[in-house]
Amino acid sequence: MTRTDTRSYPFGDPVALDLHPGYAPLRAEQPALRVRLPYGEDCWLVTRHEDVKAVLSDSRFSRARAAGREETPRVTPEAAPAGSMLSMDPPEHSRLRKLIARAFTSRRVREFRPRTQEIVDGLLDQVEQAGAPADLVAGLALPLPVSVISQMLGVPTEDHYRFRDFSATVLSTTAHTREEIVAARAALEEYLGELADQRRREPGEDLMSALVAAHDDDRLTDRELTQTGITLLVGGHESTASQFACSVYLLLERPERWALLRDNPELVPTAVEELLRFIPLGSGGAFARIATEDVEVGGVLVRAGEAVVASTNSANRDDRVFTDPDVLDLAREHNPHLAFGGGVHVCLGAQLARGELQVALTSLLTRFPGLRLAVPPEQVPWRQGSLLRSPVELPVTW
């Protein structure tokens, strides 16, 4: 394929939670093709589950070589910064991940679950007391993960407002200018530096105190400390908030879906996995990888130095892996979705996110069994110009 017939990517502006129909014929006929993103050089796009999983898991595709390069293909005005765990390869990535992983073990997540339940109950008390109609984004979807990750990091409650708007800005594709994104990231770095100083003076059992101790033992650089803090703070709430809001929207858009879970609450863990598979949460092209040597993938030879974007959204709708992939089957049993990525960069907080989603959904079903949208589905406003899809507001009644 020549440069003149390289396709533009992403494939048009999304409508609510629709997945662009262009992925299906690509998976069938051209599983790897050349695309041009809004910024950077042309790259390869892979769309089949098998190939996406391979790219995510193969060490010959480097995140580190893609970081901080203006030439790296991307959908954001500002290139992903170096020094973040998201933009490292082993062994640097392994060293940093090991420092953080102990806070996200299955045991620690299980131990935190009662606290998650307390947070959810308190938020739903406020929603119920305020009365219908209510905005479920402002009332539950956003404050829940903000509270959870803040408590894990040791962020004081009164500081939540300081990072919320900045974190939304750094995830911008078209909603903010490059200058605004750079300023927002600088503000987050300044705040994380202040928080680190505070934890150095008053250490606790939180994750930021542990990171500060590692920094002071020369196991973490200044930049790694702040960038890791930003990754945890932003990644720890934005994706979970968006996923929960999108999940409730889909359940209420078709009331029989809500009724199924209300009458069969034991299905909630299975339903959460299916919603993770079905919802195309992230924007295509968020994280490109650079081939460090020639690699064959999707029937093409990716040359050393060329970039690859792996579409997990497309992979999660691959009919080679999933029966009726475009059907939201809340009782689906075989579900090897890639919503949390794969390989060494698989989402560190996957178990934490699952726990939050399960607790919040179960509590919502129990507290408000008659929950329904307060406006027609087509009137729900959607976030625009961001790496993540989600309702801006989710008006509900009961």
UniProtKB/Swiss-Prot annotation:
Superkingdom of the organism of origin: Bacteria
Pathway per the UniProt entry: Antibiotic biosynthesis
Residues bound to heme: H93, R97, R289, H345, C347
Cofactor: heme
Listed PROSITE patterns: CYTOCHROME_P450
UniProtKB keywords: Antibiotic biosynthesis, Heme, Iron, Metal-binding, Monooxygenase, Oxidoreductase
Pfam families linked to this entry: p450
UniProt cross-references to InterPro entries, sorted A to Z: Cyt_P450, Cyt_P450_B, Cyt_P450_CS, Cyt_P450_sf
Reaction catalysed by this enzyme: nocardicin C + 4 reduced [2Fe-2S]-[ferredoxin] + 2 O2 + 2 H(+) = nocardicin A + 4 oxidized [2Fe-2S]-[ferredoxin] + 3 H2O
EC number(s) recorded for this UniProt protein: 1.14.15.43
UniProt GO BP: antibiotic biosynthetic process
Translocase listed as a keyword: no
Outcome of gene disruption: Disruption of the gene abolishes nocardicin A production, and the mutant accumulates the biosynthetic intermediate nocardicin C.
MF-aspect GO terms: heme binding; iron ion binding; monooxygenase activity; oxidoreductase activity, acting on paired donors, with incorporation or reduction of molecular oxygen
Region (Disordered) residue spans: 63-90
Entry's family note: Belongs to the cytochrome P450 family.
Function: Involved in the biosynthesis of the beta-lactam antibiotic nocardicin A. Catalyzes the conversion of nocardicin C to nocardicin A. Cannot use nocardicin G.
Name of the protein in its database record: Nocardicin C N-oxygenase
